[in-house]
């Protein structure tokens, strides 16, 4: 299978390339960048040194159409709209890693991103790329939009209790912690100011809230509101979501475990975590770095009828490039784990 990557100079594009160069069923046919035309990939993504001699090329739709079966777009939010449409119209399968086709309602782009979507009629053509929820739609899709990193991590934890009708849909709270790579590859604040922080950002209006509301509303069959507050923490990779929901009826720990096992027992990239002893009783992103797993656990606050669903992932893997490769495998009829058989790195 021949693939292309549009916009491969950032963290997400680089991680996508790292997975593709090791994928047994893939040949990278083209990699584009506006800034680095003619440069070797490893000059911009040094981890690829010795794995490929490819150079960055200009964005040429005809070349991509002639040489690629599928193209990944890993460009900044707001810049993928025209690129994705042009590829789609040339009958190329597309996996978009930006936010530009995640939301189905054009009004949500005005609400969450502050701009009108230029191609609203294409939003309905996109499948939201969480395989654990939309595998069959992904299998036949021509355009898949990968979810935001905090969105997918939270949605996977919340989907089962919402589906079971266990949740007070008026009071869902998502508390997220995310590493610095989630902010992108641009030069940022000095290390002296970033190190050691636990810093709230966009505590009331983070954009991923819209994705969580969209997916949970679809599962519940009614409009759901989510209160989400993310925090930047002093790690490079990793997301931890502590999701608080209040139960509408009594449920025991045994009931909840059965619910999660029924939802994810056969899923190869979701692991259920809750040990009675030791240090690792709940999901911890430290033990997911470099892997495509999302770990899910929970605790039950019986006094307040509150379920605390805890989920963790690597924001560049299950939260971005790993999900993209998983979606590609499904679209191409490949083994879903192909190119993704990585155990987490530890220690890091």
Curated annotation (Swiss-Prot):
CDD domains: AGPR_1_C_LysY (cd23939), AGPR_1_N (cd17895). It is found in: Cytoplasm. NADP(+) binds at residues 9-12, 315. It catalyses: [amino-group carrier protein]-C-terminal-N-(1-carboxy-5-oxopentan-1-yl)-L-glutamine + phosphate + NADP(+) = [amino-group carrier protein]-C-terminal-N-(1-carboxy-5-phosphooxy-5-oxopentan-1-yl)-L-glutamine + NADPH + H(+); [amino-group carrier protein]-C-terminal-gamma-(L-glutamyl-5-semialdehyde)-L-glutamate + phosphate + NADP(+) = [amino-group carrier protein]-C-terminal-gamma-(5-phospho-L-glutamyl)-L-glutamate + NADPH + H(+). One of its GO terms (biological process) is lysine biosynthetic process via aminoadipic acid. Pathway: Amino-acid biosynthesis; L-lysine biosynthesis via AAA pathway; L-lysine from L-alpha-aminoadipate (Thermus route): step 3/5; Amino-acid biosynthesis; L-arginine biosynthesis. It comes from the Archaea. Its main location: cytoplasm. GO terms for molecular function: N-acetyl-gamma-aminoadipyl-phosphate reductase activity; N-acetyl-gamma-glutamyl-phosphate reductase activity; NAD binding; NADP+ binding. One of its GO terms (cellular component) is cytoplasm. Belongs to the NAGSA dehydrogenase family. Type 1 subfamily. LysY sub-subfamily. The active site is at 149. The lineage of its organism: Archaea, Nitrososphaerota, Candidatus Cenarchaeales, Candidatus Cenarchaeaceae, Candidatus Cenarchaeum. Its EC number is 1.2.1.103, 1.2.1.106. Keywords: Amino-acid biosynthesis, Arginine biosynthesis, Cytoplasm, Lysine biosynthesis, NADP, Oxidoreductase. SMART domains: Semialdhyde_dh. Involved in both the arginine and lysine biosynthetic pathways. This is Putative [LysW]-L-2-aminoadipate/[LysW]-L-glutamate phosphate reductase. It holds the Pfam family Semialdhyde_dhC_1.
């Amino acid at each position: 299978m021949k693939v292309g990557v549009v916009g491969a100079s950032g963290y997400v594009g680089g991680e996508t390339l790292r997975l593709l160069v090791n994928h047994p069923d893939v040949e990278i046919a083209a990699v584009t960048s506006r800034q680095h035309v003619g440069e070797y990939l490893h000059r911009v993504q040094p981890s690829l040194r010795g794995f490929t001699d490819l150079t960055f090329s200009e964005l040429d739709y005809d070349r991509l159409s002639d040489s690629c079966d599928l193209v990944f777009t890993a460009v900044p939010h707001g810049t993928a709209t025209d690129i994705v449409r042009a590829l789609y119209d040339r009958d190329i399968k597309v996996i978009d890693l930006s936010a530009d086709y995640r939301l189905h309602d054009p009004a949500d782009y005005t609400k969450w991103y502050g701009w009108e979507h230029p191609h609203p009629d294409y939003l309905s053509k996109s499948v939201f790329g969480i395989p654990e929820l939309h595998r069959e739609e992904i299998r036949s899709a021509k355009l898949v939009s990968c979810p935001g990193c905090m969105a997918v991590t939270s949605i996977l934890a919340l989907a089962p209790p919402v589906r079971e009708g266990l949740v007070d849909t008026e009071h869902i709270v998502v508390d997220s912690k995310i590493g610095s790579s989630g902010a992108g590859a641009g030069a940022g604040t000095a290390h002296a100011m970033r190190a050691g922080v636990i810093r709230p950002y966009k505590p009331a209006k983070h954009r991923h809230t819209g994705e969580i509301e969209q997916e949970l509303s679809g599962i519940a069959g009614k409009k759901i509101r989510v209160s989400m507050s993310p925090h930047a923490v002093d790690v490079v990779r990793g997301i931890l979501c502590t999701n608080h929901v209040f139960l509408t009826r009594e449920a025991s720990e045994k009931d909840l475990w059965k619910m999660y096992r029924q939802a994810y027992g056969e899923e190869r990239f979701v692991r259920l975590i809750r040990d009675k002893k030791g240090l690792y009783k709940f999901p911890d992103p430290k033990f997911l770095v470099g892997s495509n797993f999302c770990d899910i656990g929970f605790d039950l606050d019986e006094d307040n009828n509150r379920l605390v669903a805890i989920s963790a992932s690597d924001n560049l893997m299950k939260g971005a490039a790993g999900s993209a490769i998983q979606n590609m495998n499904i679209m191409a009829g490949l083994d879903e784990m192909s190119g993704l058989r990585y155990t987490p790195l530890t220690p890091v």
